[in-house]
């Protein structure tokens, strides 16, 4: 039998090393995918910048599993005036929505203004997810529709809130919809930011605004 030459032995060693490196890289990639899947909502949502004491809020919405808190501002006109517009604001990710109220009040002084902090944001209880945020937003809309039965309702959404607002627009058909710095879908945003990960397989909360808005019949501003 022929003895292996030094060059063939070296090639075998290099090949084995490459196999080990490929296996290690594959394991690291799978570990990264697993971590992304398990921790994505902690990465995606940023409530830590929005915390506020409950006694600094003046509006709340009781949900089956959480108490949500926020703010309401009303004009000096009669609360029951059916011509007074109602404006619902859904804030951006990491936005302290209480600071949006003075700006909205200045821009829309003759409107009823409402906003809630998302679950886990501000003084609201619970953990954020797309399903939870959308369900909460629909519940808020229903409460306001019952409170202001004949008033026109405008829904405003900024950034993350544009995804929530699009879901409300699809299912509740508000009179007007205003989207500020919107995105087409969270999936496409994630694909752009993390092109090396199979985000279409991993992402739980997709906020597919383009698809949802196809069902909205009102004006989009």
Locate predicted features.
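Short beta-strand immediately N-terminal to the catalytic nucleophile in serine-hydrolase-like folds
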Residues: 155-157, 180
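Active-site nucleophile loop of the alpha/beta-hydrolase fold
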Residues: 174, 178-188, 205-209
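Conserved hydrolase catalytic core segment
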Residues: 167-175
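Gly/Ala-rich beta-loop-alpha elbow adjacent to hydrolase catalytic centers
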Residues: 157-161, 165
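The feature captures the conserved acid-bearing segment of alpha/beta-hydrolase catalytic domains
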Residues: 199-221
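Membrane-embedded segments
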Residues: 67-143, 147, 151, 163, ...
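An N-terminal hydrophobic leader/cap segment in hydrolases
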Residues: 17, 21-62
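Flexible "cap/lid" loop of the alpha/beta hydrolase fold
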Residues: 130, 183-202
């Amino acid at each position: 039998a022929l003895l292996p030459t030094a060059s063939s032995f070296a090639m075998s060693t290099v090949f084995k090393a490459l196999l080990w490196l490929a296996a290690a890289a594959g394991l690291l990639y799978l570990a990264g995918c697993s971590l992304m899947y398990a921790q994505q909502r902690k990465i995606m949502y940023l409530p830590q910048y929005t915390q506020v004491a409950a006694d600094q809020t003046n509006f709340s919405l009781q949900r089956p599993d959480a108490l949500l808190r926020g703010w309401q501002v009303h004009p000096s006109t009669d609360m029951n005036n059916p011509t007074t517009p109602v404006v619902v604001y859904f804030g951006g990710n990491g936005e302290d929505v209480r600071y949006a109220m003075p700006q909205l009040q200045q821009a829309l002084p003759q409107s009823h203004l409402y906003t809630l902090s998302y679950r886990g944001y501000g003084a609201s209880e619970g953990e954020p997810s797309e399903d939870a945020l959308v369900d909460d937003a629909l519940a808020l809309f229903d409460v306001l529709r019952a409170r202001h039965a004949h008033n026109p309702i405008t829904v405003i959404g900024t950034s993350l809130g544009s995804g929530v607002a699009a879901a409300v627009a699809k299912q509740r058909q508000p009179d007007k919809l205003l989207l500020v710095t919107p995105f087409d879908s969270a999936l496409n945003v994630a694909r752009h930011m993390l092109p090396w990960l199979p985000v279409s397989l991993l992402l739980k909360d997709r906020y597919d605004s383009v698809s949802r808005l196809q069902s909205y019949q009102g004006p989009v501003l």
